[in-house]
């Protein structure tokens, strides 16, 4: 009997070797794209790129390249039996990331099309998915019937960082990121699907989708909160409480970072996210992430690696720029540490790396410094990164610091500027911002070319503002809307506001004095009126009357 049990145990071991084999996640690089057998061809890009991605290439004269082709399905199918899980694929790097048992490594290496295998990280552990209950929705309905609001009040907590860059002047000219797509690569977006600051972009379908490249999970809303905070600086919209830098842009929320560990695999997660962003037709990548050292010290980068051509993530960031996207990356928060220098991918060429200043425009002590190892100016630009107010996961607003939070200030406003100048390439847009930064004539290693002036970059002059037309937003509206009043000479008399329905019935009649009108009027009087089209008549002086339609949903 004992002999039979021993035989059974030996058979069990022989047939279940993989159960006891140690598994890890590896990078598997291929030698080529197998173009003879690959069903994807460059002459048929609709099979692997979105229409918007193809349009971007055509608009800026960017040719399709071998790096645009997906991996060879034949190669993947050949090695798939030896993989526990396939995590990500990279057409740019011609590689994939997979969890593999140690006993399968030699079998994978034996394939002639396998160029290299490289350890990246331990296997994925069970993710922590602790959802926060009891989200408190902030009530913003207690508004006066019609009141005047200055810019500083309208923007709420974000007036200071936005006005420092004159971003509010872009917004006044109706450039708020409309028709621009921003991909946010981050560690998670907890409660973005619930928080009131994102209600505006949710109800207007401005969240195009989500992906998790870090753990292959279908949800990004129950993980880390860092991306939530970053996104709020661009997409937040609660008038008089919190207005972000690009509230009309559309967003992809892409999780590439695992908050509890740091391995080189996260750079490859980022690469997969950037490739997805490209294929989906993204205009701007916001990356408030950076890498220097890892939990496995053999994977650590050195300052010599900060040349834009060595680390995987920096090579991918340059590749993303070559596809026509504007990549905006945080410089890093190690300016007061031994490392001191920028982190990857901030060292990449052709992208914008962003440092931090305090509310007075002075260098923030923690902001990572340049130059790159090969002597290029880094960071290129700077924005406020001290005392930034961001959305917390419990619907409160908290104050925080870091280049993670100066970066979306630049990304969002860059989307607004690109909206105004769609004919510019990403490189031309970058150069336009650099030329209009306050240290352009004398860049340094702390702030690079300095703080960009988006009004000047947008060719907005004071005399233009004085001639600007009345602007009504949001239009369509649901409960309330705002009227931007141009700075024309109104004299000493009152400003008259009248609103009519399509039957010609006057449903609102208000007047304001020049001293109280300011730049913006908030109207809440139509909250109880039926949906439909209304006519606004605004008389600024006897010679200046504007009529405009507005739609209530």
Where are these regions (language model features)?
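Extracellular S/T/G-rich loop segment that most often corresponds to the catalytic His/Ser-adjacent loop
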Residues: 186, 346-419, 423
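Bacterial Sec-dependent N-terminal signal peptides
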Residues: 1-24, 523
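Primarily auto-inhibitory N-terminal propeptides
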Residues: 20-85, 103-129
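Substrate-binding/access-modulating region of protease and related hydrolase catalytic domains
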Residues: 171, 237-240, 253-350, 360, ...
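C-terminal outer-membrane/trafficking sorting elements
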Residues: 20, 465-473, 477-553
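C-terminal subdomain of the subtilisin-like protease fold in secreted/lumenal serine endopeptidases
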Residues: 159, 280-286, 419-471, 475
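Autoinhibitory propeptides
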Residues: 74-162, 168-171, 349
């Amino acid at each position: 009997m004992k002999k039979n049990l021993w035989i059974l145990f030996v058979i069990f071991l022989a047939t279940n070797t993989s159960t006891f084999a140690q598994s890890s996640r590896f990078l598997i690089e291929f030698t080529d794209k197998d173009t003879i057998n690959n069903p994807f061809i460059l002459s048929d890009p609709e099979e692997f790129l979105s229409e918007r991605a193809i349009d971007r290439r055509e608009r800026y004269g960017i040719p399709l390249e071998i790096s645009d082709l997906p991996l060879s399905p034949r190669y993947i199918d050949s090695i798939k039996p030896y993989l526990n899980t396939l995590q990500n694929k990279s057409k740019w790097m011609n590689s994939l990331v997979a969890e593999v048992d140690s006993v399968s490594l030699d079998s994978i290496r034996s394939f002639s099309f396998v160029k290299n295998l490289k350890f990246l990280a331990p296997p994925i552990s069970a993710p922590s998915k602790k959802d926060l209950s009891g989200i408190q929705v902030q009530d913003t309905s207690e508004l006066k019937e019609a009141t005047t609001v200055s810019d500083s009040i309208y923007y709420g907590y974000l007036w200071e960082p936005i006005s420092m860059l004159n971003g509010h002047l872009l917004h006044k000219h109706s450039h708020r990121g409309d028709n621009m797509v921003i991909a946010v690569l981050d560690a998670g977006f907890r409660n973005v699907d619930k928080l009131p600051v994102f209600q505006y972009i949710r109800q207007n379908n401005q969240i195009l989708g989500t992906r998790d490249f870090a753990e292959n999970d279908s949800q990004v809303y129950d993980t880390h909160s860092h991306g939530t905070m970053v996104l709020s600086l661009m997409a937040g919209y609660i008038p008089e409480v919190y207005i972000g830098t690009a509230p009309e842009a559309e967003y992809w929320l892409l999780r590439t970072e695992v908050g509890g560990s740091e391995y080189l695999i996260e750079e490859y997660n980022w690469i997969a996210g950037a490739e997805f962003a490209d294929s989906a037709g993204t205009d701007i990548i916001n990356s408030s992430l950076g890498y220097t050292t890892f939990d496995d010290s053999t994977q650590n980068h050195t300052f010599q690696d900060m040349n834009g051509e060595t680390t995987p993530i920096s090579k991918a960031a340059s590749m993303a720029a070559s596809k026509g996207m504007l990549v905006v990356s945080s410089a890093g928060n190690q300016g007061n540490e031994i490392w001191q220098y920028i982190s990857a991918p901030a060292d990449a060429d052709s992208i914008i790396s962003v440092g931090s200043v305090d509310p007075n425009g002075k260098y923030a002590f923690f902001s990572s410094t340049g130059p790159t190892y090969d002597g290029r100016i880094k960071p290129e630009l700077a924005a406020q990164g001290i005392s930034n107010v961001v959305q917390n996961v419990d619907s409160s607003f908290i104050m925080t610091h870091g280049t993670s939070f100066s970066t979306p200030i630049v990304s969002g406003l860059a989307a607004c500027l690109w909206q105004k100048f769609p004919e510019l390439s990403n490189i031309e847009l970058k150069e336009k911002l650099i030329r209009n930064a306050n240290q352009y004539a004398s860049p340094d290693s702390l702030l690079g070319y300095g703080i960009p002036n988006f009004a000047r970059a947008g060719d907005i002059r004071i005399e233009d503002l004085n001639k600007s037309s009345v602007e009504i937003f949001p239009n369509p509206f649901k409960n309330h809307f705002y009227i931007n009043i141009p700075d024309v000479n109104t004299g000493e008399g009152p400003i008259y506001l009248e609103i009519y329905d399509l039957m010609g019935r006057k449903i609102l009649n208000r007047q304001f004095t020049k001293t109280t009108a300011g730049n913006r009027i908030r109207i809440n009087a139509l909250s109880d009126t039926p949906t439909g089209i209304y006519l606004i008549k605004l008389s600024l002086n006897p010679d200046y009357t504007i009529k405009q339609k507005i739609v209530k949903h």
